[in-house]
């Protein structure tokens, strides 16, 4: 059985974190999914999260949300 590559794992975890971050924004603000996605995808955290070398994607979505809110 093939092991997933580091890139595949990073992509999976990043996508999971992004979906959870959108949920958190909606729960906290009551905004639409489109607005929540805009807030997440346009946040400074987005660039940091996509940097595989920084490995921020291994942090929990709750922790990432706290970082995003700062």
What is each of the regions a protein language model found here?
Residues 1-70:
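C-terminal alpha-helical interaction appendages
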